[in-house]
Amino acid sequence: MHLRKAKIKGRIYLSIVQSYRTPDGKTRSKTIETIGYADAFEDIYGDPIAHFEAEVERRNAEARAAEAATIVKFSPARKIDKRAEGRIELGAAVPSAYFHRDLGIWDFFEKRRTARKFAYDPCRILELLAWNRIAEPGSKKAAFESRERFPRKCDFSLDDVYRSLTYLNTHADALVKHMNEHLESVRGPRNKARLYYDVTNYYFEVENEDTDGLRKRGVSKEHRPSPIVQMGLFLDGDGLPFDYEIFAGNANDMTTMLPAMKKAGLRHAGDPEAERIIVVADKGLNTSNNIAAITLDGNGFILSQSVRKAAKQLKDWVLCDEGYRQNGSATFKVKSRIADKAVYVVGEDGKRRKVTVPVKEVAFWSRDYFERSRYEREKVIEKSRAAIRNGGMSSAAAKTSVRYAKDMPAVRETGEAASHNWVLDESKIAADEACDGYYCIIASEQEMDDREIIEAYRGLWRIEDSFRVLKSDFDARPVYVSREDHIRAHFLVCYIALLVMRLMQLDTGRNYTAAQIAQALGGIVGHRLDANAYLFDYRTDLTDELARAVGIDLSRQVLTKGQIRQIMADVRKPLTD
């Protein structure tokens, strides 16, 4: 290998090239690594050319050494060095390949290197944080303390990590846009015909909410009293994360969709060249404002509709047996109709007006959903009975877990109301039971087949699973940072880790869970034999699949430092057939 120095418009462009001979004896060369313009590195290295020439010589020496057998000698008296890290997490090479090749994150920061002189490398810090979120989720401090195990040099301080969070937040929107564009350039157009949207929240282990910030008390999905923040997430039709937005904890779910669509570049009213998309969401997003805006933008929607809370005319139609078509085993039935949905919009004059939007209403009944609803209700009924029996209604009356208890105070002979008299609300139980097993979906796509609409709606499980991965596997909450810019940067890291994880699952045939992949990658740990060699003792069919997907070999039992560095260099290069 040698360092090529090409002069381009007065500047020197550096790359590492390898010479080789063709079968007919001619000498050729191929680019091993593109480095960039020499002057872009002057703030890091005093003499960039001398630095990279030394780097090439070091790689050549390592390549020569790799040809020889690795011989390690141990002394019985040798003791463990408490000061040195004896492990290296080479499993990080796999997500690193997606980080660089598919998402182009290094390219994003490299373009901004000349615009600002960094005392630290924000790309390297982000790469470490994303790996930590996948393999060993914890605080930013914990990620920093694990840096010696990361298979790239991490010459930055803990203060640099926190400084980088501010920088990452500043460029978060541009980075997400860049990742989407780069992913399309590598893998082809994204499946945006349908985009799935949902909202969840994450709690903070603090007592007081922010006076002016994101951490606010709201409706916690985990029923916690702690301050929370809201996260709205879009997935494309293949289940890959497409964009996200962060909202204050007291924001109502239904108010998040339109700002999230705007941020993702999905609101384009009046643009005939814009790509039409169909937004698929749950009943919490089924509001007049959302439907009106989506329709006016020229987009479509598939939204669920609560049967229990539906208008009487719609509820009666859903519960009426007439028109249903059922399968042979009588476990599923469906019907549909074209209707006008009333929505209420506020005009420029501030007045609220009723307008109608033509929709297709699809109602279906499922035995599985019916039995699940009955089972869940029995638990709530029993809790209501227990609360009434134990006299615990004074503090529990507002909770949904005892929603089938009602207060019917007796009336004394004097006509005065007696003390509380809690009883089971049989009429409410009967009304809810009548709706068991029924679903209703409204869609703008009047020509779409009933089954296709139902299957599109059922695709929401992917976004629910994404939130589960973020919360359980990636430990996105509780959040251990407090400044708003750092909180937003934290969720950028989580989002990137989720996107990388979904790409790894896609490339392994979606045969493995996120937890299985994280465990497999976390197991690829080398233990230091001497100053130059590491011993690996973990290999499975899954680790082979993951390594094969990114074109590297992680099956060798002993690797030198040079070979590890070469693997990490290889995953930054485009994968060739």
Across the structure, where does each feature detected by a protein language model lie?
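Dynamic "connector" segments at or just before major functional cores
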Residues: 1-212, 225, 232-250, 428, ...
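Secondary-structure transition/capping motifs at alpha-helix termini
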Residues: 23-24, 150-156, 188-189, 237-240, ...
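Basic, amphipathic alpha-helical segments enriched in Lys/Arg and hydrophobic/aromatic residues
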Residues: 36, 483-504
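An anionic, glycine-rich sequence signature occurring as long contiguous blocks
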Residues: 227-229, 246, 300, 305-456, ...
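Active-site beta-loop-alpha junctions of metal-dependent nucleic acid enzymes
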Residues: 245-268
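Acidic, metal-coordinating catalytic cores used for nucleic-acid/nucleotide bond scission
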Residues: 252, 278-289, 307-309, 485-488
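Short amphipathic alpha-helical "interface-anchor" segments enriched in bulky aromatics
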Residues: 453-480
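Conserved nucleotidyltransferase catalytic core and NTase-mimicking acidic/glycine-rich helix/loop elements
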Residues: 497-498, 503-531
